[in-house]
Each structure stands twice: as structure tokens, then as C-alpha cells.
């Protein structure tokens, strides 16, 4: 196949979106944007990107940020391990590299939370290094370009596609080339069997288009079935606010805050009241109201939530819990998106 970079770059320079991390592609800006864009659309990321940089304009500021503030800045983006790894890496960068990301692919790859794609994006876009940056968009483009039925989630297939990506990369324009492939996958060679081939600068050399197989590519492994987990919540409100607790520092939703809940259990109202009493909470004669059922899907787990809402008299919080008023829940305590259905009641 002839080299695709001339046609690809010509298209990119005419059609690329104007994005803040492209207009000012410092290593920190590119790093932050790539981490935020994992699992999240550009349109959803931009308000968070601006807000995060306003609060934490450089790597030393990120490294020094308090955990609650960091979580609050990320609230709504989900996948909070991303921001925890951002801070871990920032602390290492301050300790080892004077607060500046190293212009070295291997050194970037050694930082917490930075995988091959993110390291490649920073190294090529910010430092101009001729390295690959292969994400799902790029894999989809090359799967169709070469009409390759390989399962793109398999390491050997990804390695082969990465080699093909590098065959076409102009070393002096590595960053633009990598961004052009990502942009093509995001705007034209889109997923779910609906590529806009009439707008593609590579249509004439695309083997899947010639074979009529674009709708079948790329091939992905069958997803594993999610584990269904029943969850019972109790939104307990007193004059001091709602009763909340911090989740453990490891595991699902680590370090975030939640209402009173019991995982792996679907409890009746009487059982909820008994559990609250066992915590040492005086529920008095309060008549609980049923919460609407809701669900939240994590990568491999699906929560099926139900529960109650009740008001109680002023009293001390049970051990391990705090009372948080609405203002504190808005500004201080980070409630994850898993409780989105109930946030109107809490905020």
C-alpha cells in the first residue's frame, strides 16, 4: 500500500477540530486531555479540562492538591482511578524530573497510569518524537484500511497494527500524523458500522471499502457478562444534613463518598430500619419513603439500586459516618456518578 500520510495530513490540516490542548500542546496539557478523554467524549471533557487547569495550572499544583479537592474537580467524569494515577505520576515527576514531564517515551511509560497510547501521544505531540500513539480510533482505521479481521483487543493483533501505523509515519511530523489518525477515526471512520467513506481521504486505498466489509470491521472480542449486584440505599437526613461515609481507599469507587448502603443485598424497609438501628442510629417513628429503582453500569459490574429515604432527629453520626449538608455535598464531598439518579434528592 502506498504511504497514506500525505493525503491524511492534507485532510487533517483542513478539517481538524480546534481544541485547547491542540492550540497549546504543552506536555501537561496533552497528558491531562488524553487521560480525561479515556472513556469520555470531547464535548463532555472540555468544561472539566478548563476547570481543572484553572485550579491546577501545572504539575506541581496537581501534585500538591488535597484529595477531596482533586476528586471534586473530577466529579462527573467517572473512572476516578484516572485522576488518582494522575496525581501519583505528578508527585513522581516533581521528585524525579523537577516538575516537568520527561521527553522520553520509556520514562513516560514508567509513570503511574500512563500506558503505551498516552506515552505515545505526549511524546509525539508535545516533544515531536517519532513514536506511535495507537488508540481505538487508530485500530479501527487500520482494521478497515487493510481489511484485517484480526480481533483488535488481542495483543498480537495490536502489535501488528502498530507496526503498520509506523510504516506510514513521517518522522518529522509524528505528532500531526498521530493526531490525524485519531481525528479520522473520531470524525469519519466512525464505529458501529457507519463510516463516512465519502468524506475519507483514504477511501481510494481502503481495502475494506473495496471489499464491502467496513460494517463488519473492526472485530472485537465478545464482552464478558457483567456481574449483577443488588444495592440497598438509605438516604438518611437530619437537621445537620445527610448521613454519608467514605468508601475504602482501594477497590470500586475508592475514596469517594456515598449514602448509607449495603452491597449484594436487597433489603425490605423493615430490614433497613433494623440495620440503621444496629449502627446506633435513632430512627424514631420516622416513616421511610421508598426510593425509585435505579441502575448504574460499571465496566464489569451492574448495580441494581433500591432503598428508602427518611428524616431523623438531630443526633451524633454513627462511627465511620458524617453528617453532610447540601452545600458540603456540592463543594466538598464527592459523590460518584453511580448515584446520579438520587443526586436531586441530595443536592
Stretches with model-predicted labels:
Residues 5-198, 202-211, 215, 228, ...:
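Catalytic cores of DNA base-excision repair glycosylases
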Residues 1-18, 23, 186-347:
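Intrinsically disordered, low-complexity, charged terminal extensions of DNA damage-control enzymes
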Amino acid at each position: 500500500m502506498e504511504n497514506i500520510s500525505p493525503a491524511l495530513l492534507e485532510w487533517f490540516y483542513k478539517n481538524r477540530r480546534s481544541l485547547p490542548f491542540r492550540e497549546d500542546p504543552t506536555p501537561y496539557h496533552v497528558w491531562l486531555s488524553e487521560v480525561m478523554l479515556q472513556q469520555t467524549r470531547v464535548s463532555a471533557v472540555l468544561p472539566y479540562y478548563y476547570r481543572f487547569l484553572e485550579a491546577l495550572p501545572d504539575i506541581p499544583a496537581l501534585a500538591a492538591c488535597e484529595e477531596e479537592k482533586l476528586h471534586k474537580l473530577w466529579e462527573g467524569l467517572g473512572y476516578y482511578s484516572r485522576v488518582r494515577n494522575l496525581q501519583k505520576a505528578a508527585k513522581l515527576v516533581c521528585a524525579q524530573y523537577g516538575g516537568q514531564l520527561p521527553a522520553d517515551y520509556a520514562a513516560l511509560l514508567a509513570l503511574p497510569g500512563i500506558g503505551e497510547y498516552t506515552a505515545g501521544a505526549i511524546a509525539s505531540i508535545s516533544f515531536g518524537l517519532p513514536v506511535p500513539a495507537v488508540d481505538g480510533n487508530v485500530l479501527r482505521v487500520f482494521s478497515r484500511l487493510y481489511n484485517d479481521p484480526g480481533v483488535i483487543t488481542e495483543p498480537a493483533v495490536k502489535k501488528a497494527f502498530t507496526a503498520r501505523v509506523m510504516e506510514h509515519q513521517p518522522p518529522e511530523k509524528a505528532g500531526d500524523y498521530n493526531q490525524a489518525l485519531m481525528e479520522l477515526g473520531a470524525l469519519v471512520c466512525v464505529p458501529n458500522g457507519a463510516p463516512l467513506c465519502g468524506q475519507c481521504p483514504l477511501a481510494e486505498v481502503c481495502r475494506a471499502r473495496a471489499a464491502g466489509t467496513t460494517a463488519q470491521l473492526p472485530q472485537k472480542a465478545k464482552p464478558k457478562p457483567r456481574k449483577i449486584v443488588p444495592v440497598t440505599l438509605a438516604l438518611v437526613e437530619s437537621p445537620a444534613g445527610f448521613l454519608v461515609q467514605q468508601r475504602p481507599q482501594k477497590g470500586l469507587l475508592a475514596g469517594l463518598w456515598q449514602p448509607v448502603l449495603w452491597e449484594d443485598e436487597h433489603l425490605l424497609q423493615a430490614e433497613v430500619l433494623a440495620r440503621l438501628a444496629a449502627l446506633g442510629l435513632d430512627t424514631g417513628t420516622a416513616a421511610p419513603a421508598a426510593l425509585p429503582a435505579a441502575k448504574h453500569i460499571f465496566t464489569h459490574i451492574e448495580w441494581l439500586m433500591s432503598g428508602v429515604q427518611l428524616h431523623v432527629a438531630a443526633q451524633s453520626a454513627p462511627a465511620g459516618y458524617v453528617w453532610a449538608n447540601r452545600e458540603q455535598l456540592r463543594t466538598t464531598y464527592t459523590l460518584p456518578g453511580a448515584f446520579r439518579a438520587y443526586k436531586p434528592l441530595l443536592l
